[in-house]
Regions:
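Short beta-strand element of the alpha/beta-hydrolase
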Residues: 59-67
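Conserved alpha/beta-hydrolase "acid-adjacent" motif
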Residues: 233-238
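Mobile cap/lid helix-loop segments that gate and shape the active-site cleft of serine hydrolases
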Residues: 40, 178-215
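Short beta-strand/loop motif that positions the catalytic acidic residue
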Residues: 225-227, 231
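N-terminal cap/lid segment of alpha/beta-hydrolase-fold proteins
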Residues: 32-56
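Primarily recognizes the serine-hydrolase "nucleophile elbow" in alpha/beta-hydrolase
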Residues: 128-189, 207
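Catalytic nucleophile-loop/oxyanion-hole region of alpha/beta-hydrolase
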Residues: 74-75, 81, 94-144, 271-276
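C-terminal catalytic histidine-bearing segment of alpha/beta-hydrolase fold enzymes
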Residues: 106-111, 240-293
């Protein structure tokens, strides 16, 4: 009888360990769940957003838009790594896999014949993502009035478009080494072609309408802006154009231009330079100050 009780006790312990492990896995899955932001709407697109929900901390939410010239996404370095970093610092993040033109559009130029993915598709996705988070704020444990957006490279252009062209109700935007202008000698041509489409890339009117530096207004929320002087992909003057426009319109913002770091370092602890990797610490200081204002 005694030996049977001794056998039962370890079995119960193992069962409790298994149950605990299953519950932990469910929590992890919940904290990193994927949703189709267009599900249940008239739009039949499948655009995924991955939630990285913070435990405790602030009730702020940040939509993360990876870069990739509006052709593809750096979903790891500028998406999921960023989401995990924000989550680990008490900020819930939502990594958006917004629509892009794709590799085939880049190589085959098929959009000369077919529409394909182009403006305003990605902006529509960001708009819907913002509305989706607002509608599900209680479920996610975030504040519906405390949603910001962070974008890298072309994703930086996207989040800036959200607050300038759509006046999305975002509390801040953080463009990191962003594409800003669609005109002139500082334009990132690959992003422009991907965004506008092969048939419309030469439209002066459309280029002007999507050049962010021309559309900053008093309704723009606070901005955290970072770039590097040695950026070999997106000319550093893009960020300087944005900084000038924000200054002219008295928009609260912090602009940090590092001498070294290049482009595409995201939230990495190894890419870029030791100097530019300080942007993450600077952002956390900035966002915490913003929350107290």
């Amino acid at each position: 009888m005694k030996s049977e009780r001794m056998r039962i006790k370890p079995m119960k312990q193992r069962l409790m360990i298994i149950i605990g492990f299953v519950l932990l896995c469910l929590q992890i899955l919940k904290a990193q769940e994927k949703v189709n932001i267009w599900q249940g709407t008239a739009c039949r697109k499948n655009v995924e957003m991955t939630a990285y929900l913070a435990k405790g901390g602030s009730k702020m939410a940040v939509i993360v838009c990876p870069g990739g010239s509006y052709l593809w996404h750096d979903m790891n370095g500028e998406g999921h790594e960023v989401g995990k970093w924000l989550q680990n610092n008490g900020i819930s993040a939502f990594v958006l896999h917004y629509r892009t033109a794709g590799f085939m559009a880049f190589f085959l130029h098929y959009r000369l014949l077919f529409r394909g993915v182009r403006y305003p598709d990605a902006l529509d996705d960001l708009t819907q993502a913002t509305l989706y988070i607002k509608e599900h704020a209680r479920e996610y444990g975030v504040c519906s009035d405390s949603i910001g957006a962070m974008g890298f490279s072309a994703g930086g252009h996207l989040v800036l478009s959200g607050v300038t062209l759509r006046q999305l109700p975002l509390t801040f935007v953080a463009p990191i080494y962003p594409v800003v202008t669609m005109n002139g000698k500082y334009v990132h041509k690959r992003s422009r072609r991907a965004l506008l489409g092969d048939n419309r890339k030469n439209s002066r009117l459309l280029r002007d309408s999507l050049s962010i530096e021309h559309h900053i207004s008093a309704s723009c929320p606070p901005v955290f802006l970072v770039n590097c002087k040695d950026d070999p992909i997106v000319k550093y003057q893009n960020s300087e154009l944005l900084d000038s426009a924000l200054t002219v319109h008295n928009i609260p913002h912090q602009y940090i231009q590092y001498k070294t770091g290049g482009h595409g370092f995201g939230a990495s602890d190894t890419k870029g330079s030791p100097e530019c990797r300080q942007w993450k610490k600077e952002f956390l200081v900035w966002i915490r100050k913003l929350q107290t204002q």
